Amino acid sequence: MKRKIIWSFALLACLCCLPSAKTKAQTKNAAIIPGEVWKDTDGNPINAHGGGLLYHEGTYYWYGEYKKGETILPEWATWECYRTDVTGVSCYSSKDLLNWKFEGIVLPAVKDDKKHDLHPSKVLERPKVIYNEKTKKFVMWAHVESADYSKACAGVAVSDSPTGTFTYVGSFRPNGAMSRDQTVFVDDNGKAYQFYSSENNATLYISELTDDYLKPTGRYTRNFVKQSREAPAVFKYNGKYYMLSSGCTGWDPNVAELAVADSIMGQWTTIGNPCTGPDADKTFYAQSTYVQQIYGKGNAYIAMFDRWKKKDLEDSRYVWLPLEFGKDGTITIPWRDSWDPRTQWEGQGDFSAGKGTFLLNGKPFVSKPQNCTIHASPRPIGTNASKCAKHWA
């Protein structure tokens, strides 16, 4: 009897050590390998195309186009407008920028209203999310389109949480002009701006947003007129503003261009292609979407690109690379076969962030926004912009 009891306890102990049927081992990534399949913590390929990052209270959130299902070319198409049905905007979260947890579809498609901007038959691209310190709202801006790309509008959604669900507010043409490839940027003083391709993608607009980040104030500038720039990605470094952008060659890659300005609404000057290494003249066969400063690591930034696969958009890949800053003021984005964001910036000086007080190498400091002069914007163009005859992906 005693032996039976001992064996029973031994069997129970073994059963307790076995993993539950509901428990799934998490996938751990060892490094970022640009252009290769990147899996989330559940072992599924990350699906967040044309997106951007948001850093909030110690966590990074990655938002992007959730492309699912068959990629099709409509029968009426006269250009390569490959598409998948709109599923929505996805969100992933991470502490280390390497291992990402799927948080779900935070802005889902609206399937029961064919006229809705988010109906599966429409187009939803380039979602970006910013946080409004005044309203405590998370605000999403995106490029929304009709199936034939004639709408050319910006769509806005809001949420009380970074993981949604976001409530769709509506769409419009900012300042009466077309809005396609776009991003949003919040300056140190809390002012937010939308950067977007307009005038049939010939000109890039910069539009100041209202204090709630929900619409334009009416102040904007026209930049790179008739130079056909798209896929803007904006960051601030050493007191200056930088914009990475792409040419307009459809789904095909082209050379990247970096521009710099002393103020967002001021003069932008192109300074060349920052990419170096194999296929740098093709932006590593990818296209810019966002640049994220890495909080807690000083002058550390990641440039995010999409490597589009036009006939299988769900399988489009991500190319993430760290920026390098030379002592002579140059900025480059060198190709890397693999790299680890957890160790990339070791020794650059760590920051520990708290509410109101920050630590720099263990010593408290307060970050105060500097006053900046914003030049009066050029005279606005008329609102009767012609419909788009061709969309460049």
Model-derived features: positions:
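Carbohydrate-active catalytic/glycan-binding domains of CAZyme proteins
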Residues: 25-361, 373
